[in-house]
Amino acid sequence: MALPEWLVKEIDGVGDHPAFAGVDELERGLRTLAAGYPEITTLRRVGTSRHGEPLLCLTIDGEPGDPTALVFGLPHPNEPIGGLTALHLAARLCADPGLRGRLRHRWRIIACIDPDGLRLNEGWLAGPFTREHYARHFYRPAGPETRWSGRSRWTTRTPTSTRRCRRRRR
């Protein structure tokens, strides 16, 4: 099955990036969009990470009755493409009323759900993109995947990012 032409154009419009975005760049991007599109956006702090970083959520309005979509980047802090993807989607939705109308949602976008983990990966985000450099600056939390399962036999506390997303989905 072929992709719709409008979606192929959206994909083709994604630009190149010389490096991945860190916590500060993702936060700046959300703040810039909120300032540039105040008639359709709201930027709120929806929580705080374990180390005191703000968890920011950009809401992009839809039409009354539209369902709400939650998008969040970096559920795994060593996968920074998610932050750039969330930020790109937010920018496209803000800039293009036709795209908002086509997708018919109210959007809640958190560009970085794990700023503490991303900060620990910032050493490799700008390169050089070699295995050695990546390995020397790599961080990923140890343990099982518990983001959406909440408590498990390995943990007694649901991760902060999971609690924030669960609250936003309601």
Which sequence ranges carry the predicted segments?
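Short glycine- and acidic-rich boundary segments immediately preceding or forming the N-terminal edge
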Residues: 1-56
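Gly/Ser/Thr-rich loops at beta-strand to alpha-helix junctions
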Residues: 49-51, 77-80
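Hydrophobic side chains in beta-strands
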Residues: 59-60, 71, 111
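Short beta-strand element of the alpha/beta-hydrolase
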Residues: 67-76
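Short beta-strand-to-loop junctions in surface cap/lid or active-site-entrance loops
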Residues: 57-65
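Active-site-proximal beta-strand/loop segments in catalytic clefts of secreted hydrolases
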Residues: 46, 74, 111-114
